[in-house]
Amino acid sequence: MSLHREPTATEVKEQKIYREMGLTDEEFALVESILGRLPNYTETGLFSVMWSEHCSYKNSKVLLKKFPIDGDKVLQGPGEGAGIIDIGDEQAVVFKIESHNHPSAIEPYQGAATGVGGILRDVFSMGARPISLLNSLRFGELTSPKVRYLFEEVVAGIAGYGNCVGVPTVGGEVQFDPCYEGNPLVNAMCVGLIDHKDIQKGQAKGVGNTVMYVGASTGRDGIHGATFASEELSEASEEKRPAVQVGDPFMEKLLLEACLELIKSDALVGIQDMGAAGLTSSSAEMASKAGSGIEMNLDHVPQREKGMTPYEMMLSESQERMLIVVKKGREQEIKDIVAHWGLHAVEVGQVTDDKKLRLLHKGEVVADVPVDALAEDAPVYHKPSKVPAYYEAFQSEKTQWIPTIANVKDTLLSLLQQPTIASKEWVYEQYDYMVQTNTVVSPGSDAAVVRIRGTKKALAMTTDCNSRYLFLDPEVGGKIAIAEAARNIVCSGGVPLGVTDCLNYGNPEKPEIFWQLEKSTDGMSEACRELGTPVIGGNVSLYNETNGVAVYPTPVIGMVGLIEDVGHITTQAFKKAGDLIYVIGEAKAEFGGSELQKLVNGEISGKAPAIDLAVEKKRQEQLLEAIRAGAVASAHDIAEGGLAVALAESMMGEAVGADVVIDGEWTTELFAESQSRFLVSVPKEKQAIFESLVEDAIHLGQVTDHPQLNIQDVNGAQVLQASVNEMLEAWKGAIPCLLKSKA
């Protein structure tokens, strides 16, 4: 039930109740100054959620301005529900990634499920039909019973929601490191398709127009969810379980179809999802973006619980709700469309010209605040920054760690069993990735590929981030995150179009954490400019700490690419015996942050692998040209585990093998994680074309019809011999085996 008596404005100030809501003393004084009076309890709540990091990006906005956001094909950059990029033929791709980390740590099934629901609404509120979902997940070590529980429940929540709503979950990534034990990361991405003429904006335009509420009723779930997402997790966080929202994917499906029908009506003026901060953010942001105001009568808000206060209604984050603005006098048209889908559209207010959010309840004005103060004019901070001692120590090391390998085969099999490298089939077999029947490349390759019906085109999509590199060197790691995502798009035959990012970090009030955020956004910005991939939207999730210990800096990159002709679609699997195997790029003795270092030492240290963005760009462009020329049978990014793992992954499940000759020190050639490298196979008859197009390609060997990996050195000495079955057993069995463990 709600509070019996809300504190008075004076009590809010004197008892410093605003601190419990997340406002600092200085911020409360600023609210008082803006209003020219003390805010009441409800108004304090409005400011506390809108000025939370989750809604305002107050600690990160200064850094986000560094990102390139413009491009020839960008139709909508940051600022709306999702970004939009033109793909020709009057069509565009809409995509966005968001986090649901804190809710997933407390209530993993619903936290993950509602993360999927929220990102779907961001995309279809733009007028786009969602065509795919992806995710990026981080957990602690699977040897921990708590981690196994979180992992299983998060995957079940993603599957449960996505499968029911009828949108395929086609790809993503899952990584495991001890730093995520108490604070898993659950980032969900949605990709949608739209015709230019259907693009919508979340704006409340037209004085006198009607504000309507569509979708599920409002309950008490998720109250202060945005504030909860803007603080560190602790032992007490378990008590905040009621702050986690509960999703209904069947309601979402009805809402999706209703909204896509609504956008065909010229009676619709604006539409926005009620996401973080619920009615507060949707109303304040829609009015602020349009330079207008909104007056709402909360008596008309559909409520599923008795006795809800204005504070509770405005801060609820109940799921499957939309706020829309409709031309005055045409409300019935909207109601009829929505009713066709079994939903209600309720008139809750109107657009005004005074730039205020005015709330009425039981005949009284319960809040009257400037919309710009809530939205655009939230305070912005540039926190102090300090280089961490660990970074200085790593950088000053005179020599870098180089492993000594006693048995190459055992090392490869052990790497294939590492959960970060091992097959994620246990995860994606729970997802319906074929619903809508447009999925061309399923989970498990470098990028997922979804065709665009009625055209020869397809979209490649991926999520990527190696947070170990970012921990060792945030700036270099930021560059690598962008480059690896682009590499995966290119390996699928696509040209990278743009980026949506999810910046997952610790507490920015700690100078060392803010330094990580600052440096990694520097690296990301530079890579985006060099590779021509504008950032069209994203999300910031800070305070990812448990009892004062932060996660690694984890800026997850969501990237979409355009494949002009489905004939160019390429996968990582070797295709047929006789094809020639090439590696593009050279291996260097770079093991800092590598899977091998983690396997051997149990921890990471040293320097991240170096990256030259000009070389990266050249190799990507040349490989894409070779793919389009029909000279490439398979392509795979060389990433975690190095060349040896890439070779193994290229023959998993295929009735082929490989004979390879390496020239150089075995450990470096096979296991170093040097950047800007690709493993490709080339039809023998296309060898001349391939070699004329790709400069840095080194011929390693060829694909065989014997399912075995044979590696020799240039002197003919046997380096490794492993059957595909042995590798497959290690790779596929690792995660299911750990989940069955009772340790």
Swiss-Prot record:
One cellular component term from this protein's GO annotations in UniProt: cytoplasm
Disulfide-bonded cysteines: none
GO molecular function, one term: phosphoribosylformylglycinamidine synthase activity
Residue positions binding Mg(2+) 1: 98, 539
Subcellular location: Cytoplasm
Active-site residues per Swiss-Prot or TrEMBL entry: 54, 100
Pfam families assigned to the protein according to its UniProt record, in alphabetical order: AIRS, AIRS_C, FGAR-AT_linker
Binding site for ATP: 57, 96, 501, 538
Catalysed reactions, semicolon-separated: N(2)-formyl-N(1)-(5-phospho-beta-D-ribosyl)glycinamide + L-glutamine + ATP + H2O = 2-formamido-N(1)-(5-O-phospho-beta-D-ribosyl)acetamidine + L-glutamate + ADP + phosphate + H(+)
Keywords assigned: ATP-binding, Cytoplasm, Ligase, Magnesium, Metal-binding, Nucleotide-binding, Purine biosynthesis
A GO BP entry: 'de novo' IMP biosynthetic process
Annotated protein name in UniProt: Phosphoribosylformylglycinamidine synthase subunit PurL
